[in-house]
């Protein structure tokens, strides 16, 4: 079955909205250190991913103003993987904080939405490499029937523009 790049992109955002956790790091900083972050979206806008963090975290300290960043995502079922590139910046817009605020975020910030440690990160997406991991049982059956796994795999990966 052929999967188009647009279908892979749709699957990525559906999985990311469901699973919400990815590894985020700054390109060229701290030997590529990444840390788990909870991704949030402003409705159906898939051009930007938002993250709440504290100003005293290593990521926030290394960020400075705006920095190229990379995120790694693996769906809970390990049926989809992605590497996402973009620009990360601090954006403590009160309206966006209010829109994205929830009880899970509130648990981390005793001072609420105006906690002095609160930092909202904005990840403006540029591109992604997406891999779809076919069911191993199905892949095994296809190989037994003479299917070329490299040919089948070619339809399960794509590099897509996200901006």
Residue ranges and their predicted role:
Residues 37-42, 75-77:
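Short, charge-patterned binding micro-sites
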Residues 52-54:
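Short His-Asn-centered micro-motif
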Residues 14-29, 69-73:
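A short, Trp-centered hydrophobic/proline-enriched beta-strand micro-motif
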Residues 58-125:
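Short, structured beta-strand-loop surface elements
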Residues 30-38:
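A positional/architectural concept
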Residues 1-21, 157-163:
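N-terminal leader/targeting segments and the immediate start of mature chains
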Residues 116-163:
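C-terminal edge-of-domain segments
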Residues 45-50:
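Short active-site oxyanion
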């Amino acid at each position: 079955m052929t999967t188009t790049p647009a279908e892979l992109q749709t699957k990525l955002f559906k999985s990311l909205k469901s699973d919400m956790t990815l590894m985020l790091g700054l390109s060229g900083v701290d030997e590529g250190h990444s840390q788990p972050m909870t991704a949030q979206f402003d409705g159906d806008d898939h051009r930007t991913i938002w993250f709440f963090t504290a100003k005293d975290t290593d990521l926030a300290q290394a960020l400075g103003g705006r920095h190229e960043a990379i995120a790694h995502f693996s769906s809970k079922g390990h049926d989809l993987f992605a590497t996402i590139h973009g620009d990360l910046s601090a954006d403590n817009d009160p309206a966006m904080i209010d829109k994205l605020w929830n009880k899970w975020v509130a648990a981390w910030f005793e001072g609420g939405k105006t906690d002095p440690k609160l930092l909202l990160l904005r990840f403006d997406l540029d591109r992604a490499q997406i891999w779809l991991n076919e069911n191993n049982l199905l892949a095994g059956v296809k190989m037994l029937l003479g299917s070329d796994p490299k040919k089948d795999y070619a339809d399960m990966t794509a590099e897509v523009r996200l901006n």
